[in-house]
Structure formats: structure tokens, C-alpha cells
């Protein structure tokens, strides 16, 4: 799936709020870089952490609530 399609799906998950999406992706990418386990099947050696985080949001695996709670 193309990045544009994933981004469109992720935006729908956060109510089309680009600020929320960027916050969620940035925090989740940081967590992934610090050793968190990806919630989607992704080859972390071939994908950037931000792309994995975006895919997690698009699939509804993570949202703003999880970021605020510190998960």
C-alpha cells in the first residue's frame, strides 16, 4: 500500500486532525526507536519507525489515548 493511502486511513482514525496524527506518529516512532515492539507485522530493518507508527495508526492499533497514557 502506498504511503498516501496509509496516511489517508490514519487521518480518518484521528478525525482528520493532522496535528494529532503527527503527534501520535512522532511519539510512537520514538518509542519504537527505543525498543518498543511493533503492533503490526512489519520488517523493522526495511521500514522507518515513522512509517511503522503511521501504519499502526491506520490499522487502529494505536491512538492518542495510548500516547497520553504513556504506552
From Swiss-Prot:
GO BP terms: namely: DNA-templated transcription
Q: From which organism does this entry originate?
A: Campylobacter concisus (strain 13826)
EC numbers, comma separated? 2.7.7.6
Can you say what this protein is called? DNA-directed RNA polymerase subunit omega
User: Keywords, A to Z?
Assistant: DNA-directed RNA polymerase, Nucleotidyltransferase, Transcription, Transferase
What does this protein do, in the record's words? Promotes RNA polymerase assembly. Latches the N- and C-terminal regions of the beta' subunit thereby facilitating its interaction with the beta and alpha subunits.
Q: Which family does it belong to?
A: Belongs to the RNA polymerase subunit omega family.
Q: Which domain of life is it from?
A: Bacteria
Oligomeric state and interaction partners are given as: The RNAP catalytic core consists of 2 alpha, 1 beta, 1 beta' and 1 omega subunit. When a sigma factor is associated with the core the holoenzyme is formed, which can initiate transcription.
Annotated gene: rpoZ
